[in-house]
Amino acid sequence: RDLHLLSRRQRQMCIRDRSYTRRAIDSYEMIDNGDKIAVGISGGKDSLTLLYALAELRRFYPKKFDLIAITVNLGFDNFDTTKIEQLCKELYVPYYIVDTEIYDIVFNIRKEKNPCSLCAKMRKGALNQKLNDLRCNKIAYAHHKDDFIETFLMSLLFEGRIHTFSPKTYLDKSKLMVIRPLMYINEGEIISFKNDMQLPVIKSPCPADGYTKREYAKQALAELEKETPG
């Protein structure tokens, strides 16, 4: 997907998102020479936008880094990654899929009433193992500006403390650095980018999707935005 093959609108969107991403990376020194960075691809708009932004940035960024994409397949039926594989080929990014039986364990064997916590723990375990095998030293998560605000609200409402994501976090156990390059981009801008670039988004097949504390925080913030815009 070379820029000269895109429409003027698409080029503008690429340059804008790349600019925001680079500003975050430079502000918090997220990337060093020789890094091997993985992007965790869920199939959602956020992770695909991050993949695109980093793939574009890699072309001219002064610090040279390798980039791969990786998806943890939880074992849902009809989870088709064909279009994501094609996007990765177009962006010259190696793509890896980690097949698991997490869905079966969480929903059928354990029958978890609150499945998100166990699922996240198992998913991260499978992801970190693969990253270790591939000798990646950094993982880029697609948390955007709205995610940071929602996490702050969730910690306040449900934990009684003030907390949100850090721009980068070192994980001692897995010897990995987590970076969050989309922190300056809001969700509306990501939606526009996804639509303009026709990114191959996969709808989440998870039966618990839409019933999380994060979704509650998202809706609460949307109501606040209606009442007091800006």
Regions found by a protein language model. Name each.
Residues 1-15:
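Single conserved hydrophobic/aromatic residue that forms the stacking wall/gate
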Residues 20-39, 163-230:
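ATP/NTP-dependent adenylation/nucleotidyl-transfer catalytic domains that generate, transfer
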Residues 59-64, 72-130, 160-162, 166-169:
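ATP-dependent adenylate-handling ligase core
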Residues 100-102, 144-146, 206-207:
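Short, ordered loop/turn segments at secondary-structure junctions
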Residues 108-111, 151-154, 213-218:
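Short secondary-structure transition/capping segments
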Residues 117-188:
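Active-site adenylate/phosphate-handling loop in enzymes that bind or generate adenylated species
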